[in-house]
């Protein structure tokens, strides 16, 4: 009788309390109120993964719990505190971050298993906190939280036990594995190859450090600076120019000789041109006797021109070179046709001069150089040329020419 009386009195209050709990569970995302029952979490006695029960078993368990509560109602003064505790657990689950990833949050039902049978059975949708003595191993790599490599897993920096942050069973972090990054060891730069091109050959050296390469380049740059002037200085030594430079100062002692004989050493070009004019005159003369005399005179005149400079000991070599070059140039200087025309021109000019000017002072410098001598000899030669027209004329012409090559008379005439 007392049980029926107590059940009738508390029936209305029990129904009102259940309605409020369902509204609160719907607000925190437990499901669709009375239509969708809460999912039951089953915990094994050993460390294993969680498994979900089917919806039919969950509905049957919920029906059994309702019938038990109706049959044996139980009232306690700690019901309000338990409701606040459940709301705090749900708020903690939300703050952990599972709601932000879009994962539905389910409250763990009060399963009647083993050590959990001591909890009050009338709390239907209340959340349950995992106790400190959890069957899950915190050192399991599946539940290990990524941390610094210097921080140990079991012991913190202060020496106490390492405290892991609280997490819900439906959290995505629980089933994730964290990879370990390998050490980033930068490979050392290998020594480069050194390639040297020298004298048309290629030399390659391996494992040459930059310092050694810089030293080699520095030595090469230092060696290239003095080598350039030395090569320039050695090049002229291979040529014949230095002997020519040595002979230039040796010609200077011949200056006193040039003062004594200015006609012979004054310039090499006129000395070469004079024998050419004499040879042309000799070839142009019609008489055989005059040609023979002129040739003999030319050969005789060439002797004094060459012998005095060769007699001097210092300038012996340059004078011999000059004579050889003059002998090589003489036949090549004037062609044969020009020689004949020049001889005819000189012959006619000589005839005009002799007919117009009977005195030797009016002669041209070329003819005066050919007919050099004393004043008496020149007068006699001019009279002989004007009066004679036979072989005596040619012989008289030869006499002043033989005398004209004396060493004393030409100097006086040219200076005046």
Curated annotation (Swiss-Prot):
Polar residues composition bias: residue spans: 283-302, 366-389
Predominant cellular place of this UniProt entry's protein: nucleus
Biological processes annotated in GO: regulation of defense response; regulation of jasmonic acid mediated signaling pathway; response to wounding
InterPro entries hit by this protein: CCT_CS, TIFY/JAZ, Tify_dom
Stretches with biased composition (Pro residues): 306-317
PROSITE patterns per UniProt: TIFY (PS51320)
Keyword terms of this UniProt record: Jasmonic acid signaling pathway, Nucleus, Transcription, Transcription regulation, Ubl conjugation
Tissue: Expressed in roots, shoots, leaf sheaths and leaf blades.
Ranges spanned by the short sequence motif Jas, renumbered to the chain: 335-359
Cellular component, GO annotation: nucleus
Domain Tify intervals: 187-222
UniProt short sequence motif Nuclear localization signal, positions renumbered to this chain: 337-344
Region Disordered: start-end pairs: 1-25, 283-319, 357-416
Induction: By methyl jasmonate (MeJA). Induced by drought and salt stresses.
PTM entry text: Ubiquitinated. Targeted for degradation by the SCF(COI1) E3 ubiquitin ligase-proteasome pathway during jasmonate signaling.
Subcellular location: Nucleus
Domain comment quoted from the record: The jas domain (335-359) is required for interaction with COI1.
Function: Repressor of jasmonate responses.
Annotated family: Belongs to the TIFY/JAZ family.
Quaternary structure note: Interacts with COI1A. Interacts with COI1A and COI1B in a coronatine-dependent manner. Coronatine is an analog of jasmonoyl isoleucine (JA-Ile).
UniProt name for this protein: Protein TIFY 6b
Organism, scientific name: Oryza sativa subsp. japonica (Rice)
UniProt gene name: TIFY6B
């Amino acid at each position: 009788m007392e049980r029926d009386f107590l059940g009738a009195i508390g029936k209305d209050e029990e129904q009102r309390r259940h309605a409020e709990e369902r509204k609160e569970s719907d607000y925190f995302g437990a499901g669709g109120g009375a239509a969708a029952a809460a999912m039951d979490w089953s915990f094994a006695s050993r460390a294993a993964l969680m498994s979900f029960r089917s919806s039919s078993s969950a509905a049957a368990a919920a029906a059994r719990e309702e019938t038990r509560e109706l049959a044996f109602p139980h009232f306690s003064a700690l019901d309000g505190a338990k409701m606040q505790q459940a709301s705090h657990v749900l708020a903690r689950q939300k703050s952990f971050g599972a709601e932000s990833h879009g994962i539905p949050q389910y409250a763990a039902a009060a399963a009647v298993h083993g050590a959990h049978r001591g909890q009050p059975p009338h709390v239907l949708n209340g959340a349950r906190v995992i106790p400190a003595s959890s069957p899950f191993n915190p050192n399991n790599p599946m539940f290990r939280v990524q941390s610094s490599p210097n921080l140990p897993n079991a012991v913190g920096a202060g020496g106490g036990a390492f405290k892991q942050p609280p997490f819900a069973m439906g959290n995505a972090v629980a089933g994730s594995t964290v990879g370990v990054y390998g050490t980033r060891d930068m490979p050392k730069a290998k020594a480069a190859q050194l390639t040297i091109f020298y004298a048309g050959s290629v030399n390659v050296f391996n494992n040459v450090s930059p310092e050694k390469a810089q030293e080699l380049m520095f030595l090469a740059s230092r060696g290239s600076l003095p080598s350039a002037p030395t090569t320039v200085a050695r090049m002229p030594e291979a040529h014949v120019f230095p002997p020519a430079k040595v002979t230039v100062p040796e010609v200077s002692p011949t200056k006193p000789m040039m003062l004594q004989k200015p006609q012979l050493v004054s310039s090499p070009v006129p000395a070469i041109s004079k024998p050419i004019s004499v040879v042309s005159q000799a070839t142009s003369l019609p008489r055989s006797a005059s040609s023979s005399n002129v040739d003999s005179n030319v050969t005789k005149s060439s002797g004094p021109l060459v012998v005095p400079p060769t007699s001097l000991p210092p300038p012996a070599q340059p004078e011999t070179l000059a004579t050889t070059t003059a002998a090589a140039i003489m036949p090549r200087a004037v062609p044969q046709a020009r020689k004949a025309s020049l001889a005819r021109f000189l012959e006619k000019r000589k005839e005009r001069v002799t007919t117009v000017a009977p005195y030797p002072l009016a002669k041209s410098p070329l003819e005066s150089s050919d007919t050099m001598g004393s004043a008496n000899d020149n007068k006699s030669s001019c009279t002989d040329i004007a009066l004679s027209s036979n072989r005596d004329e040619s012989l008289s012409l030869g006499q002043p020419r033989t005398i004209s090559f004396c060493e004393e008379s030409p100097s006086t005439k040219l200076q005046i």
